[in-house]
Amino acid sequence: MPGVAVKLYSVFFKLLLKHRLQNLISISAADGLSDSFGVSTRSDESVAAANPSFTDGVATKDIHIDPMTSLTVRIFLPESALSPEPDSLRHKDNYNHQPRSDRRHSYGPNHNSPAPAERNESRRNSYGCNNENLEPYGGYAPSAKRNSRKLPVMLQFHGGGWVSGSSDSAANDFFCRRIAKVCDVIVLAVGYRLAPENRYPAAFEDGVKVLHWLGKQANLADCCKSLGNRRVNGVEVKKLNVQGQIVDAFGASMVEPWLAAHADPSRCVLLGVSCGGNIADYVARKAVEAGKLLEPVKVVAQVLMYPFFIGNNPTQSEIKLANSYFYDKPVSVLAWKLFLPEKEFDFDHPAANPLAHNRSGPPLKLMPPTLTVVAEHDWMRDRAIAYSEELRKVNVDSPVLEYKDAVHEFATLDMLLKTPQAQACAEDIAIWVKKYISLRGHEFSY
């Protein structure tokens, strides 16, 4: 069973969340909150500022990718991208090949495991490069003189019951830094529009938009490699050979330099947390439908962490664990009322139930490999497991990692982020994900 501290925190968490949801419902009913631009973060939530310098092995920056909406992306670039064979990567490989008896099992922490050794190796300075190569803004800037690696890209969709959470929240920043390091990937945390200002399908459309933006960035970067200084249609276009950017006569950058230098979009993974899992699964379906139209972007796998699934016919866990920790069923129902348009409210809505009879999109057999993470004390667990089972029936690699004595968001909630179980979950995800992002080749194809 979860500890006393978790139980107490859960009580206060649910009270505050229920109060917020009820306020949003009343305001939405009275005044209406529809706003096409939307909001991607709440003013009362703790956020972590982006830091383009390498701090604890990761540099971050925020990109506002759609001028018509509040859609943003926070990029998490691991320091391992600066060297073809970083020492930290070798250490990780050695760690991942330890005997299984020395690792936590997939159901939670192994309390007999020794604490990880402190890293004593020398590190680069806070910018990951020599001072003479720094850009004026003081953060990391790719350089043609420096060795670099192409890393897989992971699109991450945060949780928060559709109405809260953000790509730059303190908890999400910590989690994405951890994932970027253990998986050795560039993480793009998506700041999708929240409800009720923007109801379904806004958040889902934002996820697809980021995937297309990633493809556009890759194509622009390729174009930049062959483009010299020239005039196109009377407009001066310049090539910056150090950062791989294309700028117009006004100096506006069209290419994101970190992605141009380090991203390999042909090895793209989706990771969704709670309601973000619903978004990730939707984006995966759209990627399968698009097929080669998305090239060079290729979604090779997805990770669904305790997805926010529900349905009209309650499962055993939905009945037995309805009043479980943090996001219990009554509170989650309020969240769904704020997210789904009133005329579409139905627990068998395709956004809510992945196995609904009215599900659209490609057949399940075409879905990418899917890792599902569930918690023992989460009322949503059975439906997530059922979805995984249906994928396995059509020969999709779809394992389930179930963690004992765990609660919903046990690996991503602010209070629980530094627990051994949260660290173990990230490491288990990394082991599975690396099967599909290895440079030795991909096992999955549309």
UniProtKB/Swiss-Prot annotation:
Span list, region Disordered: 84-131
Enzyme Commission number: 3.1.1.1
GO terms for MF: carboxylesterase activity
Biased amino acid composition, Basic and acidic residues: 87-105
Function description: Carboxylesterase acting on esters with varying acyl chain length.
Known tissue expression: Expressed in roots, leaves, stems, flowers and siliques.
Gene name of the encoded protein: CXE16
Keyword Hydrolase in record: yes
Official protein name in the record: Probable carboxylesterase 16
Active site: 274, 378, 408
EC top class named in words: hydrolase
Family per similarity comment: Belongs to the 'GDXG' lipolytic enzyme family.
UniProt keyword Hydrolase, yes or no: yes
Extent of motif Involved in the stabilization of the negatively charged intermediate by the formation of the oxyanion hole: 158-160
PANTHER family tied to this protein: ARYLACETAMIDE DEACETYLASE (PTHR23024), CARBOXYLESTERASE 16-RELATED (PTHR23024:SF455)
Keywords: Hydrolase, Serine esterase
Catalysed transformations (reactions): a carboxylic ester + H2O = an alcohol + a carboxylate + H(+)
InterPro entries per UniProt: AB_hydrolase_3 (IPR013094), AB_hydrolase_fold (IPR029058), Carboxylest/Gibb_receptor (IPR050466), Lipase_GDXG_HIS_AS (IPR002168)
Pfam family, one: Abhydrolase_3
